[in-house]
């Protein structure tokens, strides 16, 4: 390939001929990592028929380097010994990088779709690929994203790390099982010798064990400590939501108390998503020192109002759950419908992630939340 390169101009070229052939692509188990999260393609759709020819993600490189290709990752899982195909995933690489770093622009390769911005230089970009310890970026585009494309949402990097640690612990347990069996036999011999010595000294260990078990049983049968918040003699603004209907303490939902759908209001802290919602609420010190405060007389009381502004990550699933609760009382049917759809998507995602066996052209992408944020403003007057 010439080092100088040429400017890309698609002209009237047909989209359907871009980088598609019947030949097999090369296999490589050490495939470089993409800078970006992948796209999951709706099953039954053809990526090359839907992908705009200038479909280059934003955020890396200069104007001349907005050129590259989408690389297919085929996936399947084994169900009762049968292979079940899963939706394809597509990863973006810049020209001169990735699993097809040696390919020229528009070379016909199986599982490769070439894209470029008009005016980009038709030469290797030298941008390289992502390091294993770096997070992948969320996908952003100038134009419209086809409806059949699902832009993968960033997940917690800690989850991937914990899965890896879990596998490592499993291997260690398997390797040490033989040593443990040997040590157990040795410990049993020592224990028997100690018990025999105690018996000679007149110590009845069996009776002591029975008394200990009896005390443990008595403790387990004792009354469980009542954890219900004591709200009766507290001001509204000092009360704590417990398990059950919160309208007893905070009243029905209205324009001045507009947070919570039917399920959340009816179940309080025992509602399914209450812990996730609580994580989205500012701390006491944040409210105290990060809010705008005003006060005025209201009969024999003082009415205090504060305005607090903070930001939540837009792509965080907890943020979506939190926003669903705002003014939910005013649109009950719409909220119920959205919750059913979200529950259905969640079950579908859980099924698709089980027993996934990718083919050789694959990468496991590391991901964290994007910095795009949404602004929340609270006004509390109670």
Curated annotation (Swiss-Prot):
Annotated membrane-spanning segments are none
Name any one GO molecular function.
Answer: RNA binding
Arranged from A to Z, the UniProt key words for this protein are: ADP-ribosylation, Host Golgi apparatus, Phosphoprotein, Ribonucleoprotein, RNA-binding, Transcription, Transcription regulation, Viral nucleoprotein, Virion
- Please note every region of biased composition (Low complexity): 154-163
| Stored Pfam families | CoV_nucleocap (PF00937)
| Domain annotation CoV N NTD: ranges | 31-153
The answer to whether UniProt assigns keyword Transcription to this entry is: yes
Q: Where is this region: Dimerization?
A: 231-334
Q: Known InterPro entries for this protein?
A: N_prot_C_CoV, N_prot_N_CoV, NCAP_aCoV, Nucleocap_CoV, Nucleocapsid_C, Nucleocapsid_N
Main localization (coarse): virion
Basic and acidic residues bias located where? Answer: 201-235
What is this protein called in UniProt? Nucleoprotein
